[in-house]
Amino acid sequence: MAMKGPGLFSDIGKRAKDLLTKDYTYDQKLTVSTVSSSGVGLTSTAVKKGGLYTLDVSSVYKYKSTLVDVKVDTESNISTTLTVFDVLPSTKLVTSVKLPDYNSGKVEMQYFHENASFATAVGMKPSPVVEFSGTAGAQGLAFGAEAGFDTATGKFTKYSAAIGVTKPDYHAAIVLADKGDTVKVSGVYHLDDKQKSSVVAELTRRLSTNENTLTVGGLYKVDPETAVKARLNNTGKLAALLQHEVKPKSVLTISGEFDTKALDRPPKFGLALALRP
């Protein structure tokens, strides 16, 4: 099912967030994906973080309008996600649980319309947390709100509101989050029609502490297989990333970060290799 309409609430401001944070890693990570003759996709991921190693194996199988995803890791956790498309017209039903924590289960229903979208999630436990979000808009303009309510305490766990604008050459968003305590303004501007070069900025202000965080960044696609990204915030943290498609669908990512205001501290480096058929 192709998503239509203004998208979910979580999509507002996502372009800026992804450009500033997606694919940056400071660990060593290897991901190998394969597809069996029966159509089952298998993905093994090994991560070295400091002196610790973790490993997880996930399998994905799609049958008609149903998608099953099961992941097992070295901590003996089993995560299962069942996604059913078009249970009702223009809907998506997602059920997830992470064992052995039976209370982690959640059921979410998403509905997509040409001018609106809604999502409701309910925890699978007595007195669960109920979450709701809605977005409405047209012609690249979207308004959204979300809230979470704990039925055990009778209190709201969160409430947020946002407005987003999406045009061919730019994306902008204003988000009021953390129960009204955080204001986040972000924008992405594409410098050319093919979106080979983009710049991004994000300003976050926490009202309770009068704390401001400004992050700027950019993306440049050297060629169809190679891209570089960089970001810098007002605290002096500078990060850069190089991503290269070594063969179709297989990507090597090298990233690093250092504190320009504390050059005596060692920089962080990360390497990730994703191999796909």
Curated annotation (Swiss-Prot):
Organism of derivation: Oryza sativa subsp. japonica
Gene: VDAC5
PANTHER family linked: MITOCHONDRIAL OUTER MEMBRANE PROTEIN PORIN 5-RELATED, VOLTAGE-DEPENDENT ANION-SELECTIVE CHANNEL
Name of this chain's protein: Mitochondrial outer membrane protein porin 5
UniProtKB keywords: Ion transport, Membrane, Mitochondrion, Mitochondrion outer membrane, Porin, Transmembrane, Transmembrane beta strand, Transport
Glycoprotein keyword on record: no
CDD domains: Porin3_VDAC (cd07306)
Function: Forms a channel through the mitochondrial outer membrane that allows diffusion of small hydrophilic molecules. The channel adopts an open conformation at low or zero membrane potential and a closed conformation at potentials above 30-40 mV. The open state has a weak anion selectivity whereas the closed state is cation-selective.
Alphabetical list of Gene3D superfamilies matching this protein: Porin
